[in-house]
Amino acid sequence: MKRLLLLVALLTAVPVQAERYDFGQGVAAMACSMLDSGYSRREVENVLDSLERFIIRDGISARGQRQMVKGYNYQTARLGCELEYRD
């Protein structure tokens, strides 16, 4: 149930400037927080994959994708999260 609520919260935030570095950083911070809260890596990666599909489906530009990924990868490295590198 918590996972479903978290996914809904993420999806409602997607249209708000998804094409920015800080959005990617925010997603990474949320994902790292999920890991710290006891979610398995697989559960977190599944949420991230779902979010990625929704963002792409909504028509994010290639430039926006690069910015988001750069922010995400920067933040996961900075926080030392054991999450997959996105490209």
Where are the regions a protein language model picked out?
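N-terminal signal peptide c-region/cleavage motif recognized by signal peptidases
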Residues: 13-15
